[in-house]
């Protein structure tokens, strides 16, 4: 993982944190984001969206989602949601899988359920364990 990729992992983690500041239901926001055109743009080798900043990215997701973005539901702690956002982006760089494919393997419920166990692990180990959980389904 290079420095730029790690910075983009941090940006995505902070983007997810901003959804907490906006009091968006976390599960709905994460699902919407991971299946969005914004996430797809971040998956590309180079896209201007990667350097747009988390505030702009959040506005893009909210605008594109329209009424589909649920403002109800549990709002996760910033620690949990940052880790989820960071790991999802790290996973993309680690495996080159799309955000949509990653979300299919580890939906938000899986990420939240395993946070306490996995957040202290090296990202690669957590990702491999999450992939193993998916394979066992």
Language model regions located:
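C-terminal alpha-helical interaction appendages
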Residues: 1-94, 106, 118-137
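Catalytic and binding regions of secreted/periplasmic enzymes and modules that target cell-wall glycans
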Residues: 102
């Amino acid at each position: 993982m290079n420095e730029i990729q790690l910075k983009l992992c941090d940006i995505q983690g902070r983007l997810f944190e901003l959804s907490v500041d906006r009091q968006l239901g976390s599960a709905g926001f994460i699902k919407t984001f991971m299946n969005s055109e914004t996430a797809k743009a971040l998956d590309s080798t180079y896209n201007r969206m990667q350097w747009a900043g988390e505030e702009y990215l959040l506005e893009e997701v909210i605008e594109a989602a329209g009424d589909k973005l649920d403002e109800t539901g549990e709002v996760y702690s910033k620690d949990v949601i940052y880790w989820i956002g960071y790991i999802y982006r790290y996973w993309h760089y680690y495996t080159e899988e799309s955000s949509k494919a990653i979300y299919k393997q580890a939906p938000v419920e899986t990420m939240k359920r395993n946070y306490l166990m996995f957040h202290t692990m090296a990202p690669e180990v957590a990702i491999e364990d999450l992939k193993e959980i998916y394979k066992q389904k």
